[in-house]
């Protein structure tokens, strides 16, 4: 039995490995090596937000933006979960995977006042009667992915509202003026045609 075992594993009398062990044995050895480590998914919060500390999720504002704050304080947000709508397979009506994030926009001092005002004008359909900005996500069957998408929506809103519109060049201003003049000429021409058509109809009826 020992001889057969030695031949099977390709071992010499001194214990030197002559042949590579089977693949399943290599996998077992690999599993034994990683038993002491902690596995983290690529979608874990530590990897999605590597600069996050405690309840604050760090976010770098673009250089061209005026927004001074560089983080989204999670403790200032109201986060809740509910059941998603639509088809969900085995999870339908069983798992609270839909994420909802809301916060009072007017009192969100971690966003500059001009940025808050622009967000209130641009996304007024997302603000309820209590003045809360409500964002939802149910694109994934996992809570943390939907939560990450809601936070990304907040970042996109802040970045969009923080951008300073650039001044048009002289050439762009000239082209814009020519387009407006052309539109006005076409509008007056159509107006004259309609007036002439109505006049001809009255003359025909008389």
Swiss-Prot record:
PTM sites of type N5-methylglutamine: 90
Species of the source: Mus musculus
InterPro entries the UniProt entry points to: Mito_Release_Factor_mL62, Pep_chain_release_fac_I
The organism's place on the tree of life at top rank: Eukaryota
Chain segment of the transit peptide: 1-29
PANTHER family to which the protein is assigned, alphabetical: LARGE RIBOSOMAL SUBUNIT PROTEIN ML62, PEPTIDE CHAIN RELEASE FACTOR
GO biological process, one term: mitochondrial translational termination
Subunit structure: Component of the mitochondrial ribosome large subunit (39S) which comprises a 16S rRNA and about 50 distinct proteins.
Keywords associated with the record: Hydrolase, Methylation, Mitochondrion, Protein biosynthesis, Ribonucleoprotein, Ribosomal protein, Transit peptide
GO cellular component, one term: plasma membrane
Entry's EC annotation: 3.1.1.29
A GO MF term: translation release factor activity, codon nonspecific
Protein's gene: Mrpl58
Major subcellular location class: mitochondrion
Location in or out of the cell: Mitochondrion
Disulfide bonding pattern of the chain: none
Family indicated by similarity: Belongs to the prokaryotic/mitochondrial release factor family. Mitochondrion-specific ribosomal protein mL62 subfamily.
Record PTM text: Methylation of glutamine in the GGQ triplet by HEMK1.
The protein's name: Large ribosomal subunit protein mL62
Function: Essential peptidyl-tRNA hydrolase component of the mitochondrial large ribosomal subunit. Acts as a codon-independent translation release factor that has lost all stop codon specificity and directs the termination of translation in mitochondrion, possibly in case of abortive elongation. May be involved in the hydrolysis of peptidyl-tRNAs that have been prematurely terminated and thus in the recycling of stalled mitochondrial ribosomes.
Reactions catalysed: an N-acyl-L-alpha-aminoacyl-tRNA + H2O = an N-acyl-L-amino acid + a tRNA + H(+)
């Amino acid at each position: 039995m020992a001889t057969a075992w030695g031949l099977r594993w390709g071992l010499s009398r001194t214990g030197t490995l002559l042949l590579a062990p089977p693949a399943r044995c290599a996998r077992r050895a690999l599993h034994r090596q990683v038993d002491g480590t902690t596995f983290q998914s690529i979608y874990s919060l530590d990897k999605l937000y590597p600069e996050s500390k405690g309840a604050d999720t760090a976010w770098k504002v673009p250089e061209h933006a005026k927004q001074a704050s560089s983080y989204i304080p999670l403790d200032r947000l109201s986060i809740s979960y509910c059941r998603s709508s639509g088809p969900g397979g085995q999870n339908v009506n069983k798992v609270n995977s839909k994420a909802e994030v809301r916060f009072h926009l007017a009192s969100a001092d971690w966003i500059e006042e001009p940025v808050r005002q622009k967000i209130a004008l641009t996304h007024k359909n997302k603000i309820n009667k209590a003045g809360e900005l409500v964002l939802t996500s149910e694109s994934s069957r996992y809570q943390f992915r939907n939560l990450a998408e809601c936070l990304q929506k907040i970042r996109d809103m802040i970045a969009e509202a923080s951008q300073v519109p650039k001044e048009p060049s002289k050439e762009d201003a000239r082209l814009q003026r020519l387009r407006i003049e052309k539109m006005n000429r076409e509008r007056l021409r159509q107006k004259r045609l309609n007036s002439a058509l109505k006049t001809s109809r009255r003359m025909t009826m008389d």
